[in-house]
């Protein structure tokens, strides 16, 4: 689940609160939809890892989730999913977006949010409504893919995000007093590596 970049300034000013909201909304979305018999009718296992940067080291708030391909029914029986992806991406997207923006709006109404200069205008209720309405109209893009030859490989893939630094020494190409140049993967699989200077 990736949050639109329009949220970045507000999230940055409210990291603990809004990272927590992201965790909550991801879990609730997956659990609520999984419990629906249309999709699974059971409670799956879920692992979530918050990630706050991308290959270019930009602030890019998103949640990696691993969800089991089945779960426990209310009768404590194991139920397997019928297909590869048992919840359609558009259903996940719409449920998550509605949940996140609704709870974010509740935080706003209850004066729980901090505002810095980068998002200070949102303190004005008219600005807030306009900003929020634009986020509702924007298409949010959750990304779903099949595991890599089994659950163990998915855990290994996720582990690379949780047990490494943002950039390894082997990626650093040059360092000057003012800049660092490093190589990053292509944005899509199969694209060549890129050089980025910060």
Region annotations inferred by a language model:
Residues 1-198:
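Beta->alpha loop/short-helix hinge microenvironment recognizer with preference
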């Amino acid at each position: 689940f990736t949050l639109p970049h329009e949220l970045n300034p507000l999230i940055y000013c409210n990291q603990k609160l809004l990272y927590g909201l992201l965790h909550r909304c991801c879990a609730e979305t997956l659990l609520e939809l999984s419990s629906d018999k249309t999709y699974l009718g059971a409670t799956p296992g879920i692992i979530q890892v918050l990630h706050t940067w991308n290959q270019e080291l930009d602030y890019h708030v998103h949640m990696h989730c691993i969800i089991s391909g089945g779960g426990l029914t209310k009768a404590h029986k194991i139920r397997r999913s019928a297909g590869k992806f048992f919840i359609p991406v558009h259903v996940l997207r719409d449920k998550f977006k509605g949940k996140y923006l609704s709870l974010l709006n509740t935080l706003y109404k209850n004066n729980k949010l901090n505002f810095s200069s980068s998002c200070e205008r949102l303190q004005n209720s008219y600005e807030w409504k306009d900003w929020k309405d634009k986020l509702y109209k924007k298409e949010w893009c959750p990304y779903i893919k099949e595991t890599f030859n089994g659950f163990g490989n998915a855990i290994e893939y996720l582990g690379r995000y949780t047990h490494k630094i943002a950039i390894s020494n082997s990626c650093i190409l040059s360092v000057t007093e003012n800049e660092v140049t490093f190589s990053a993967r292509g944005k899509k699989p199969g694209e060549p590596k890129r050089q980025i200077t910060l």
